[in-house]
Amino acid sequence: NGIQKLKPGTYMTIDSERNIQENTYWRPNAKRPVGNVSEEEYIERTHELLTAAVTKRMNASDVPIGVLLSGGLDSSLIVALLKEAGHERIRTFSIGFEDIDDEAGSEFEYSDQIVSRFDTEHKKYKVSNQEVLPRLSEAVMNMAEPMVGQDAVAFYLLSEQVSKHTKVVLSDRKSTRL
């Protein structure tokens, strides 16, 4: 269909004669530290940076914040870091679909474990298979950028429900304002 996503740190200009030019405005300055750094030091520094990032986002909002919890590694880590940083009242939200044949439609069994372990205020939303297809075009029209897969519709439907309870959520995608 000719629509493609630009590379990170670039912008595109198109002149009146339809000449296209892609330009880079930013490149990450990623350099390895000088000297020998142990695996333990990398782990400690990564933990510090992740904790700082999550805490910064929690403290930057003047409204209650939630977490979109799939039960996967990334969203579970966000919940764990929030709890570790002293946030007692963590709101979490999960979505699931009906099972089809042998394929599980929800990952509630995983998110439930995180909810139990970290004692979050949790809401689950189960979407019927009949609801997904009619909402697909609406979900695509409201996306900031093209996404493919069942989770694209899931993210949209979950966001619709979550927005009734909070306006800012953290997710494994990025911090999102609903």
Language model features with spans:
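ATP-dependent adenylate-handling active sites, centered on carboxylate activation for C-N bond formation
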Residues: 16, 29-178
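N-terminal segments that mediate ammonia production and transfer
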Residues: 1-40
